[in-house]
Amino acid sequence: MKQYIFFLALIVLTATFAEAGKKTEILDKVKKVFSKGIAGVADLNNMSELGCPFIEKWCEDHCESKKQVGKCENFDCSCVKLGGK
């Protein structure tokens, strides 16, 4: 009995989306958002691979001028003092 109710509800939902013509529009929007998200992650990955050596070198030079050691993580430069003297 539960299976019949489930399939009946599924048919009603499918018919509702098909009649309104929204089924393909909703799927297209979801696909566009998903593809934009994937492209954004790929772009961010490419930028970090290309930009990290330059930013890390700048960070090391910046912290060296303060007589500290620099470390770059996720485009964030942090300087740390070595020793207590």
From Swiss-Prot:
InterPro entries: Long_scorpion_toxin_alpha/beta. The keyword Metal-binding does not apply. Keywords: Disulfide bond, Ion channel impairing toxin, Neurotoxin, Potassium channel impairing toxin, Secreted, Signal, Toxin, Voltage-gated potassium channel impairing toxin. Residues 21-37 form a propeptide. Disulfide bonds join C52-C72, C59-C77, C63-C79. Expressed by the venom gland. The keyword Disulfide bond applies. GO terms for cellular component: extracellular region. Residues 1-20 form the signal peptide. GO terms for molecular function: potassium channel regulator activity; toxin activity. Residues 49-85 form the BetaSPN-type CS-alpha/beta domain. It is found in: Secreted. PROSITE patterns: BSPN_CSAB (PS51862). Contains 2 domains: a N-terminal domain that is unstructured or forms an alpha-helix in presence of membranes and a CS-alpha/beta C-terminal domain, which consists of an alpha-helix disulfide-linked to antiparallel beta-sheets. Belongs to the long chain scorpion toxin family. Class 2 subfamily. This is Neurotoxin beta-KTx 14.3. It comes from Lychas mucronatus.
